[in-house]
């Protein structure tokens, strides 16, 4: 199921301003394309360079996903677009194909920016972009503050066609006049709701959207699995001049944001019992690979000198877990090299990754069969993104599960998540299922 809305939407203020709606002609064109197109090549219809399409086919991108079928006609026409579809649906490939269709491979200038909220997501986007580019153009990653001085000289000497950057690194380079955005044709903001929801990043993002370049001179693409109050967001995009007035909202699967094949479970236990319950779950489930999500350490806890919960969980599992999976740590306070090492180590083999929510956005670890919420997510959207790390292609047909550990007082919060995201959560009877004495 897919829904399309132009910026005109139901808002009367938008209609009065004379903004163009997403017309019937566009809808019919998309329907015809969906009915007839069998391959990604046919969807792209000659608007993506041949060498990029060939490379995409070589690595397995042959049949388009639903979001690619629905969005590529809009993206490849050069229109501003809000890509709104669940995690693992193919948004990254969709916007990268649009980027490659827009840039001039023979020109030495920055022509496309992809802005990401985390370095890990940036690493993944950069990898896909470089695979597709196949050395036909330069793709530079600005993801680590410690490397920016060296990269500043590189980007001045030979400007890359595409830059993938975190908000902070990008703003730092722009303010140092490391490169010009005069030639920029495409601006992509990935996980846009996450960046707008981050007090550390939102002001810098607004600068990127309005101060450093103008919406009228570029194609703007927003991507996310979750955009709360999306009609309002579309209106704000136009009102604040983040996009042009004919921005198109492509919303795939709006009714069922949670992948339907996932099993959701929960166990009620005290916080003191939580580590042992987690251990018993791991022994019982025997996951192929798993991610254990733990809450960020509070400032109060830091000031008190307490170790982060991630460290506590990792140390506990390394001394008690007897399974074959390697226990690894990933958290925001780790330096770039340590985080990159952890991310590289989990690729292609069995693992238990203990992480904060940094791993919930854009992480592509398809072998993940089990998610464990050691701490309850703050919002339903956070639950959705954590759950989206499992059940991904080509493993989506496997029995994948999300298990949340909660106290009695947190039960109502989990029920609220179920109502909002429309999924059912089965209770695990802790006392009868686990062998240890609680």
From Swiss-Prot:
InterPro entries: DEAD/DEAH_box_helicase_dom (IPR011545), DEAD_box_RNA_helicases (IPR050547), Helicase_ATP-bd (IPR014001), Helicase_C-like (IPR001650), P-loop_NTPase (IPR027417). Gene3D superfamilies: P-loop containing nucleotide triphosphate hydrolases. Its main location: plastid. PANTHER family: ATP-DEPENDENT RNA HELICASE DDX6_DHH1, DEAD-BOX ATP-DEPENDENT RNA HELICASE 47, MITOCHONDRIAL. Disulfide bonds: none annotated. It is found in: Plastid, Chloroplast. One of its GO terms (molecular function) is ATP hydrolysis activity. SMART domains: DEXDc, HELICc. This is DEAD-box ATP-dependent RNA helicase 58, chloroplastic. GO terms for cellular component: chloroplast. It comes from Oryza sativa subsp. japonica (Rice). CDD domains: DEADc, SF2_C_DEAD. ATP binds at residues 85-92. The Q motif is unique to and characteristic of the DEAD box family of RNA helicases and controls ATP binding and hydrolysis. Coiled coil: none annotated. It catalyses: ATP + H2O = ADP + phosphate + H(+). SUPFAM superfamilies: P-loop containing nucleoside triphosphate hydrolases. Pfam families: DEAD, Helicase_C. Its EC number is 3.6.4.13. The lineage of its organism: Eukaryota, Viridiplantae, Streptophyta, Embryophyta, Tracheophyta. A motif (Q motif) lies at residues 41-69.
